[in-house]
From Swiss-Prot:
It holds the Pfam family CTP_transf_like. GO terms for biological process: coenzyme A biosynthetic process. This is Phosphopantetheine adenylyltransferase. It is found in: Cytoplasm. It is an enzyme of class 2 (transferase). Belongs to the bacterial CoaD family. It catalyses: (R)-4'-phosphopantetheine + ATP + H(+) = 3'-dephospho-CoA + diphosphate. PANTHER family: PHOSPHOPANTETHEINE ADENYLYLTRANSFERASE. GO terms for molecular function: ATP binding; pantetheine-phosphate adenylyltransferase activity.
Length: 156
């Protein structure tokens, strides 16, 4: 079975992320969403909270699995027999960065390719960073995030 992985910090998962997951789930029989533990990043939600928010957000997708990881992505890819890495690219800046990561991951995994998904137009401006900034300044993020994330933010 072809399995792909969509790694990210997802702090929090946005509707842009969810759109990419849903589109991937239509194309591939198995999509793994790997939530990264990034000690160098100051996250709003803990790893456990982020994993649970992603799980709740993709509960309607039967071929999507969610887990947290702290290891090198290349090692996770080998452990799960992954065929390709899914990455979202909004801008040319994203593309340049992702191109470098794709080359590195291809080297470290002995050939696993990265597949770049442009965002749906309505989500092209959305990022976790923007969502956090709006939230921290008291703005309404209801249209930008899945319902479980909005509820978790309201409860904070």
């Amino acid at each position: 079975m072809t399995s792909v992985i969509y790694p990210g910090t997802f702090d929090p998962i946005t509707n842009g992320h969810l759109d990419i997951i849903e589109r991937s789930a239509v194309i591939f029989p198995r999509v793994l969403v790997a939530v990264a533990n990034s000690p160098s990043k100051k996250t709003l939600f803990s790893l456990e909270e982020r994993v649970e928010l992603v799980r709740q957000s993709v509960a309607h997708l039967s071929n999507v699995e969610v887990f947290g990881f702290s290891d090198l992505l290349a090692n996770v890819i080998k452990q799960h027999n992954i065929s390709a890495i899914i990455r979202g690219v909004r801008t040319t800046t994203d593309f340049e960065y992702e191109l470098q990561l794709a080359a590195l991951n291809r080297l470290l995994t002995k050939g696993v390719e990265s597949l770049f998904f442009p965002p749906a137009e309505k989500w092209a401006f959305v990022s976790s960073t923007i969502v956090r900034e709006i939230y921290l300044h008291g703005g309404d993020v209801a249209e930008l995030v899945p319902v479980p994330v909005f509820n978790a933010l309201k409860a904070r």
